[in-house]
Amino acid sequence: MTDPRKGDHAEPTTHFGYQDVPESQKAKKVAEVFHSVAAKYDLMNDVLSGGMHRLWKRFTIELSGVRSGNRVLDIAGGTGDLAAKFSRLVGPTGQVVLADINESMLKVGRDRLLDRGVAGNIEFVQADAEKLPFPDNHFDCVTIAFGLRNVTHKDEAIRSMLRVLKPGGRLLVLEFSKPTNKLMSKAYDAYSFAFMPLAGKLITNDSESYRYLAESIRMHPDQETLKAMMVEAGFDRVTYHNMTSGIVAVHRGIKP
């Protein structure tokens, strides 16, 4: 029944972690989280994953099939881990676009890669995954690592990624997922809701952002659901690979 105080046009809500918030507010709240943690994002990734995030990303790159001369889009590219590696793979005849909706994360990534001297074939673009500002059929490969769970309309973002890919192009989605056994799931819950906020407090003086991280992982679609979303968007040959007992999964789809 419609609440008469809200009228017939109440704004739809979505989840921000375990909270329900108006859709128009989620992007702002996510931006605040990443603005808070941007400076120490890489350090926290190493601490929270025990360095495993580097192996997960390496496997994703291996699955991508990126080679010299390719054009690659790395969405939610943050501090540039994937972009730096793709830059070497595509070489001087290729191009990497590092896109992120968050200005603070984009600045950290740009400064980091410029300092390392690997930004010659990398373009930095502030962009919304749901409305990618690129031409149709433009990229050989699109990646998004640990970013899709923060997107308000995931289905729209996946369709946008399909649009900008060339026929035969690959989408790789690396994201936290659902552990494949109960024992690991219980241990992971204890770790996520106790250690992660504590580490956030000690290292970044921000426990709430890492509590959101734990909650956002639980609200993200599981492996089969995300696979179905990619198929529904129009991708062919969609597969996924579980890593670390399903704590993380990488999905791959091909544009027909």
Curated annotation (Swiss-Prot):
UniProtKB keywords: Menaquinone biosynthesis, Methyltransferase, S-adenosyl-L-methionine, Transferase, Ubiquinone biosynthesis
Q: Which pathway? A: Quinol/quinone metabolism; menaquinone biosynthesis; menaquinol from 1,4-dihydroxy-2-naphthoate: step 2/2; Cofactor biosynthesis; ubiquinone biosynthesis
Q: Which GO terms describe its biological process?
A: aerobic respiration; menaquinone biosynthetic process; methylation
Q: Which InterPro entries match?
A: SAM-dependent_MTases_sf, UbiE/COQ5_MeTrFase, UbiE/COQ5_MeTrFase_CS
Q: Name one Pfam family in it.
A: Ubie_methyltran
Biased segments, Basic and acidic residues type: 1-12
From what superkingdom does this record's organism come? Answer: Bacteria
Substrates-to-products reaction catalysed: a 2-demethylmenaquinol + S-adenosyl-L-methionine = a menaquinol + S-adenosyl-L-homocysteine + H(+); a 2-methoxy-6-(all-trans-polyprenyl)benzene-1,4-diol + S-adenosyl-L-methionine = a 5-methoxy-2-methyl-3-(all-trans-polyprenyl)benzene-1,4-diol + S-adenosyl-L-homocysteine + H(+)
The residues that the entry says bind S-adenosyl-L-methionine are: 79, 100, 128-129
Q: Name one GO molecular function term.
A: 2-methoxy-6-polyprenyl-1,4-benzoquinol methyltransferase activity
Its family remark reads: Belongs to the class I-like SAM-binding methyltransferase superfamily. MenG/UbiE family.
The family database entries (HAMAP family) matched by this protein are listed as: MenG_UbiE_methyltr
Functional summary from the UniProt entry: Methyltransferase required for the conversion of demethylmenaquinol (DMKH2) to menaquinol (MKH2) and the conversion of 2-polyprenyl-6-methoxy-1,4-benzoquinol (DDMQH2) to 2-polyprenyl-3-methyl-6-methoxy-1,4-benzoquinol (DMQH2).
Q: What is this protein called?
A: Ubiquinone/menaquinone biosynthesis C-methyltransferase UbiE
The record lists the organism as: Pseudomonas entomophila (strain L48)
